[in-house]
């Protein structure tokens, strides 16, 4: 099955950063247009009360989308590995921002 993976980005005590908000909005539009489930990924730093994945999922609670929060990982590699190992993801559209697109593509390719 193909998924839409939303990579984590900063959140501030439960409020999404501009970058995370943009990723989630784009993912929701894409997933709805292509009838795909969404996986939000991203853990939390020491002292944080909320995970990046949890904040992203909460943004989508009112949408009629199939959303899973995988509250693990602190970087692109660990987030993609968690999606593969915990949820069996082998095919996905990965939502990130333009500055991270090439690096994300290379990491995804390396990790299978």
What are these regions (language model features)?
Residues 1-112:
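A structural signal for short, hydrophobic/glycine-enriched beta-strand patches
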């Amino acid at each position: 099955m193909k998924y839409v993976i939303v990579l984590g980005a900063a959140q501030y005590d439960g409020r999404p950063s501009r970058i995370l908000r943009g990723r989630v909005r784009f993912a929701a539009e894409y997933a709805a247009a292509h009838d795909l489930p969404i996986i939000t990924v991203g853990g939390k730093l020491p002292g944080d009360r909320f995970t990046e994945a949890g904040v992203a999922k909460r943004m989508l609670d009112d949408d009629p989308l199939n959303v899973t929060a995988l509250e693990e990982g602190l970087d692109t590699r660990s987030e993609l590995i968690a999606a593969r190992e915990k949820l069996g993801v082998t095919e996905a559209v990965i939502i990130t921002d333009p500055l991270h697109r090439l690096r994300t593509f290379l990491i995804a390719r390396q990790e299978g």
